[in-house]
Amino acid sequence: MKHLISMRDLSADKTLQLLKLAERLEKDPSQIDLSRRVMAAMFYEASTRTRMSFESAMKRLGGEVIGMVGTSGTSVEKGETLADTAKIMARYSDI
């Protein structure tokens, strides 16, 4: 799976798998090294806590974050679709 948009995108087995992995990584975060990795984050609506938690987690794991909040100053204002914007962001990021 490349993108997780909704919990409905996950089967019950996959959800359980992810929860077990999260539990293991929570006990020993040194297993994760995201240095030299870039995460793209696109927030079309204000979501301060969610955005900050994603950015904080990525930075704590050694990675960087690029992104956008809202559509002001983006090509969306010129008519670019969400899908096109997501494709471009994916080219500039690893996650």
Where are these regions (language model features)?
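Positively charged, low-complexity intrinsically disordered leader regions
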Residues: 1-56
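Phosphate/diphosphate ligand-binding glycine-rich loop within oxidoreductases
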Residues: 34-95
